[in-house]
A protein has these predicted regions:
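N- or domain-start disorder-to-order transition segments that initiate the globular core
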Residues: 229, 239-243
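Acidic/aromatic-lined carbohydrate-recognition and catalytic surfaces
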Residues: 1-228, 260, 267-290
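Structured alpha-helical segments in the cores of large, soluble enzyme domains
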Residues: 246-259
């Protein structure tokens, strides 16, 4: 029976191994259930875990599956339970999120496009594109100042780069001059020349126009953004939990922990942000009680 919880924020500086150390103390306090912040893979360095980027695995910064199982076993041996916070409403987006990256790369044809609450037809001139309000100025000004460039990795991968942010390219749109870099590191200089000068700027603009996303001035977010966010936080994108397939794919790991009797209870963060909160809770309860 749940009578008293004690909440802990788990992160790289306070991982599961450290949590285990205080189980005897919590037991002596009379705590019935330990309540943990989200444990699914979040952005590297996240101190809270609510910016999940991969719901299919445990956050490697907080520990291993064996350490989670050991913590649950120690709690259960002490007559205590484990409650976990989960975040079905949104995910952190960016290069760390392989599902979002796949959507930016392949557009609405991506198998993960159904995960995200994107209105692909919101703008007639931008139909089929995700609007990313990430620029500090209008795109033309950004190009004029040379702030948008190519990012060529040591392995030969090519992305668009805007200061610290990078964006994927649809492989079908990458011209031969840039494709060569993947096979010949010596072609890097030629690739860099490809974007120099006025002609290079025009080529870069044409390349960007062929992507499944639009880089826009951040001030345009309120009127132009076409994906649901967590309030007005641009890098937390809403998920389509009313879609049964999305529910299944994003909850498989958590439900595995429940089925294996590692997790004894779930707390749902921001459930009111979902399209159908009641429907979600009914579905979740049914899955948990299987």
């Amino acid at each position: 029976m749940l009578t008293a919880t004690y909440r802990l924020q788990v992160h790289k500086d306070f991982p599961l191994a450290r949590v285990r150390e205080i189980v005897p103390y919590l037991n002596a306090l009379g705590i019935s259930h330990l309540y943990l912040s989200p444990l699914l893979a979040a952005r590297p360095g996240s101190t809270h875990g609510y910016d999940v980027v991969d719901p299919t695995r445990l956050n490697p910064e907080v520990g291993t599956e064996d350490e989670l199982r050991a913590l649950a076993a120690e709690l259960h041996d002490a007559g205590m339970g484990l409650i976990l916070d989960i975040v079905p409403n949104h995910m952190g987006i960016g290069p760390e999120n392989p599902f979002w990256e796949n959507v930016l790369t392949h557009g609405r044809q991506s198998r993960y496009a159904r995960w995200f609450d994107i209105d692909w037809d919101a703008h007639p001139k931008r139909r089929g594109k995700v609007v990313l309000p990430a620029l500090g100025d209008e795109l033309a000004a950004v190009l004029d100042k040379g702030e948008l460039r190519l990012d060529i990795s040591e392995s030969g991968g090519v992305r668009l780069k805007y200061y610290d942010d990078t964006y994927p390219l649809d492989p079908a749109t990458v011209p031969p001059e840039l494709q060569l870099v993947q096979f010949d590191p010596g072609a890097k200089q030629a690739a860099e020349e490809w974007v120099r000068g006025e002609e290079g700027k025009a080529r870069l603009r044409a390349l960007l126009d062929r992507q499944h996303y639009v880089l826009a001035f951040w001030r345009c977010a309120p009127s132009d953004i076409n994906y649901r966010r967590f309030f007005d936080v641009n890098d937390l994108a809403g998920l389509r939990m009313a879609d049964p397939a999305v529910f299944d794919e994003t909850h498989a790991k958590v439900l595995e922990w429940v089925s294996d009797e590692i997790i004894d209870g779930l707390r749902i963060d921001h459930v009111d942000g979902l399209r159908d909160p009641l429907g979600y809770l009914v579905r979740l309860r049914a899955e948990v009680q299987r």
